[in-house]
Amino acid sequence: MIVGTVINAAGILLGGVLGLTLKRQLSPARQNAIKGLLGVLIVFFGLKATWVSLGGGAWLVLKQLTIIVLALTVGRLAGRLLRLQKTANRLGRTAGETFTRFAAASPGTKPKWNEGFLTCTILFCAAPMAVLGAAQDGLDGYWATLALKAVIDGLATMAFVTVFGWSAMAAVIPVVALQGTITIAAQYVAANTLSPAMLASAHGTAGLLVFCVAMLILDLKKIEVADYLPALAFAPLITWLWK
């Protein structure tokens, strides 16, 4: 089951419907309040995911934490070589500029359907939470991250539909395709390849990365989260090697 992705899709569609109905965005004060609440919740669920992945005696917990740190270190090196964060930044910047351009345009200026669709697709799919949440959902059914992403995407869609119309809501299709594929692939790997210890290390690593996303949302620390995404693959690999 792709529970998290279904919740995420519902959030996008609900936000779009509300945006088209109300024809206005939330006030800056309400946006900031929701942003702060989401940041706190993401901190909680991220650290909770890491905490529940740890278990056993002091030596075993130390070993598990060491594996997570090693995975993050190696993962970041791989991510930088693959230029994951730079690519995500470039895509996000392009999408943001497109939205800003049409938001500031005269009322008679209407964007093409594909411009709204592509802009929202990039913003929803290039977010680190898309990969992290979908992977967590597939590895052990932990869909809380995608539920929080559903709120974020829903609020964004409320704003996007006022500029792009219903084409912004159509971005739900690639979101479901991408996140659903990641979740199903993670489910297959978890069921056929990973041991409980390997699953725990991947889940713990994902939890810390989700915590890093909260630091970005709360404007506390600029962390290149996308560069760390390969750590999700390195964590179970290091666990397997360190028997």
Predicted segment positions?
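Transmembrane-helix boundary and interhelical-loop signature of multi-pass inner-membrane proteins
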Residues: L18-N32, T50-A58, A159-T205, L209, ...
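Membrane helix-loop-helix hairpins that form the core translocation module of multi-pass transporters
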Residues: K23-L26, R30-R90
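Intrinsically disordered, low-complexity non-transmembrane regions of multi-pass membrane transporters
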Residues: P28-A29, R83-G116
